[in-house]
């Protein structure tokens, strides 16, 4: 039992070998004190500053109406900042918007593919739009079809595809010109879990090839799995920033929960007193639960060993155990007080953005 527990508590974080950028990295995205105020006086973005290094995968989280959509539309040149500056790949979004657009891929919440066309036809149109040299188009199309695993259906109309397949095709269309930076705005909203997981794999492939990815998402486990770093937005301001692990460390420690077979109050009191008396657990918190006990400790593996020694000495039979670690949901709740996941922007925010787009 103890060996199984140690295996459970030693599982790696959702994304291992995170490469947090250093000051030596060149910046792919440089936003400095960005404000965006709408015509009605509403300030949707209030002093956002972001440094995103080349090759980084950044997650951008926030509750409804926090300003996520407004921020990303400003970064991709669909809105001008009212105050502050934004540089993408070294180009200023206000004075050099066309250069910015040519150097990025932008996947909006709404699918941009033509469902009446095939993947191959959609990609060919995208190549023409982005000015991919004609002698390179066929090779790029085949490479992208392989990347998103649509080669076998490359000549079937996209309207026959599942939502996940359409998202994968949409992903491919924003990559035809090989942009060094890709912006993904709620890319997996509405997909079932299996489809989301497959799309995640393709995003990881894109990032592993050196592409910088800026992701807004309503799925916190998505950010945990994919992102090197996360920024949390509320009321148009960034209120927290860091790696998923560092943010989770701020809200608590791991919890070991043990259920006894046929527990009695007397038995639980006796065991809890014995566990609290263990010197190696002086930094742990031990509490009674309806079925047994719960132990919160900085080192849950060490705590588990001590707890199981006490239970063995007390001849207490165990029916189940579990280890819970802090999640980004816990971080999000502690920061925003919102018990819902970071969700899609409000209709008001999207409507305002649509009426104040930068002229192309």
Task: Briefly describe each language-model feature range.
Residues 201-296:
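ABC transporter nucleotide-binding domain
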Residues 316-324:
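Conserved short beta-strand edge segments in small beta-sheet-based binding/regulatory domains
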């Amino acid at each position: 039992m103890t060996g199984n527990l140690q295996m459970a508590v030693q599982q790696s974080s959702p994304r291992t070998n995170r490469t947090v950028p250093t000051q030596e990295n060149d910046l792919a995205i440089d936003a400095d004190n960005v404000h965006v105020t709408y015509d009605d006086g509403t300030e949707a973005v209030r002093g956002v500053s972001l440094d995103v290094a080349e090759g980084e995968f950044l997650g951008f989280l926030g509750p409804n109406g926090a300003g996520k959509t407004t921020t990303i539309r400003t970064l991709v040149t669909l809105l001008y900042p009212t105050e502050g500056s934004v540089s993408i790949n070294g180009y200023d979004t206000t004075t050099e918007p066309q250069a910015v657009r040519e150097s990025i891929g932008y996947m909006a919440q709404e699918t941009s593919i033509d469902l009446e066309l095939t993947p191959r036809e959609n990609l060919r149109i995208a190549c023409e739009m982005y000015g991919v040299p004609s002698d390179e188009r066929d090779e790029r199309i085949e490479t992208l079809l392989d990347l998103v695993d649509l080669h076998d259906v490359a000549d079937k109309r996209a309207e026959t595809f599942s939502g996940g397949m359409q998202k994968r095709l949409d992903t491919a269309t924003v990559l035809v010109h090989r942009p060094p930076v890709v912006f993904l705005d709620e890319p997996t909203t509405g997909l079932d879990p299996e489809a989301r997981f497959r799309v995640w794999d393709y995003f990881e492939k894109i990032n592993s090839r050196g592409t910088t990815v800026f992701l807004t998402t309503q799925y916190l486990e998505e950010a945990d799995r994919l992102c090197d770093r996360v920024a949390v937005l509320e009321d148009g301001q960034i209120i927290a920033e860091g790696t998923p692990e560092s943010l989770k460390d701020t809200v608590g420690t791991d919890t070991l929960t043990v259920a006894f077979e046929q527990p009695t109050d007397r038995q639980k009191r006796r065991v809890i007193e014995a566990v609290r008396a263990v010197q190696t657990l002086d930094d742990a918190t031990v509490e009674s639960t309806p079925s047994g006990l719960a132990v919160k400790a900085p080192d849950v593996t060490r705590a588990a060993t001590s707890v199981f020694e006490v239970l063995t000495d007390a001849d207490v039979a165990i029916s189940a155990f579990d280890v819970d670690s802090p999640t980004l949901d816990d971080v999000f709740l502690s920061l925003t007080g919102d018990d819902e996941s970071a969700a899609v922007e409000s209709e008001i925010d999207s409507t305002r953005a649509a009426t104040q787009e930068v002229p192309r």
